[in-house]
Every structure is written in structure tokens, then in C-alpha cells.
Amino acid sequence: MLGALVPALPAFADTAPGAPFVPTPLPVVERMLELARVSPGDVVYDLGSGDGRVVITAAQRYGARGVGVELNPVWVRDARRFAELLGVTDKVTFRIEDLFTTDFRDATVVTLYLYPAMNRKLAPRLLTELKPGARIVSHEYGIGDWPPDHTEEMVVNGERHRINVWTVPPPGDPRPK
């Protein structure tokens, strides 16, 4: 259902502050959530959530709670409208916050589609603030020197997409830098 709304997004990406919004194709979103083994008990955070498609899909398909963190208020406004139109406002929230300072300690799943440098900068917080067993799924990019537990590629509309998955280790396990 979200796919029907995507063409209605305003064309503001070229003038928006920060990193450009490049939406993850819905088949990739769905596979990311499958690989994260999302279930109704999960709290899914999407850091740099854009139009909200990841957390909205997590709520629709899996009954999970979702939190979208996005700096651009226009995208947050649109994400909230999509959530309302799709009937998931009881399951999702969208915050106008900096993803480097937002509190995501209650997340059981974190999704990313950020530049590699941003992922590297987030790595220490992901490792120390998420509970052991939390899953991190990144569309396209790795997280510094932290090797993913699983990597998968898929082709959507002729474009190749990589999905990387990590599980936060217990504190005693060796941790990446």
C-alpha cells in the first residue's frame, strides 16, 4: 500500500538540507526486515528515515513498533501523513532529531541507509547503547571494520542492492573498532 503513495512525494530532495533522500526500494525494505527477523515484539528504528517507509512497513507487515529519526521536517511531516493514511499511527512515531544524538537504546532493530562515514561514526554508539542481540541492517554500506554476519545482494528494476546484517554481540565478545 505504501508503494501507491510513493509517487505522491514532493520533489524537494534537491533543496533539502543534509544528505540527499534516496528512498530504499520497497522490495529491499521488505527483505531488510525479513533478514532482521522482525516480529511484533520488536522496536524498529530507522536512522535517517526519509518518508518513513521502513518503520511503516515494519508496523504493517510485522506489527512491530517503529521510530523514524529524520532531521528534515518536511520528510517527517510526509512520513506522519503516510502513517495516518495507512492506519499505523498507533505503532509508529517520527522524530525530528539528529541521528547522532537521538536516544535509540530501546531499539531491537536499527536500519540504516547512510553514507559509509556516517555508519562509521555511529558504530561506537550502536555497539555500546544497543542491547546484545539487537539487529542492525544496512542498505548498501558497511559499518567501518565491523564485518557483517550476513550479506545479501538483490536486483530491483535492474539496480543491484546490497543488504548487510549484524547482531550486537555480548559485552565480553571482541568488538570491532
Predicted region positions:
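Bacterial N-terminal signal peptides
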Residues: M1-A8
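Class I SAM-dependent transferase core
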Residues: L9-S39
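A short SAM/SAH-binding and catalytic strip from SAM-dependent methyltransferases
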Residues: R105-K121
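C-terminal substrate-binding/active-site "lid" region of AdoMet-derived donor-dependent transferases
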Residues: A117-K177
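Conserved class I S-adenosyl-L-methionine
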Residues: G41-G50
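Conserved SAM-binding motif I beta-strand of class I
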Residues: R65-E70
